[in-house]
A protein has these predicted regions:
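Single conserved hydrophobic/aromatic residue that forms the stacking wall/gate
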Residues: 2-13
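Conserved short histidine dyad/triad with adjacent acidic residue
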Residues: 14-16, 22-32, 41-59, 93-94
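Ligand-binding loop in jelly-roll beta-barrel domains
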Residues: 24, 36, 84-85, 93-114
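Short acidic-glycine-tyrosine-enriched beta hairpin
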Residues: 29, 77-92
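Solvent-exposed residues in well-ordered beta-strands and their adjoining turns
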Residues: 44-48, 77, 112-114
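Short, conserved beta-strand element in jelly-roll/cupin
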Residues: 58-74
Length: 114
């Protein structure tokens, strides 16, 4: 779906693809919102070969992730965590972190970067 609807306001916004890294597909959920305090994204992680190294990233601030579909291997500061549908995590995004889709299936998650 390319549209986001605010039920209370009736406004419709087009999701905007954003390239934060080539490792994952990001869609901004607040593109065009002036003065926002957070950056919400719908993120898709496609499965990769088992032997492919995980891409690690770090950026200022904090990050909240909630898995919407699939199973995700999340590495934060050399610690591995497995998140399943409905699981969420809030962490210091200045620490090196990366994600990998598990079970040969793509993963979708909500990411909010503060």
């Amino acid at each position: 779906r390319d549209l986001v609807r605010s039920r209370g306001l009736g406004d419709v916004y087009k999701r905007q693809a954003v390239e934060r890294t080539k490792a994952y597909k990001y869609q901004s959920l607040a593109a065009g919102f002036v003065g926002r305090k957070a950056d919400p994204f719908l993120v898709t992680v496609h499965p990769k070969p088992e032997d492919e190294p995980m891409y690690l990233n770090s950026h200022p601030g904090q990050e909240y992730n909630m898995v919407l579909k699939g199973r995700l291997l999340l590495q934060i500061n050399n610690k591995d965590l497995i998140l399943e549908e409905g699981d969420s995590i809030y962490f210091n995004s200045e620490l090196p972190h990366g994600m990998k889709a598990l079970d040969g299936e793509k993963v979708s998650f909500l990411a909010v970067i503060l």
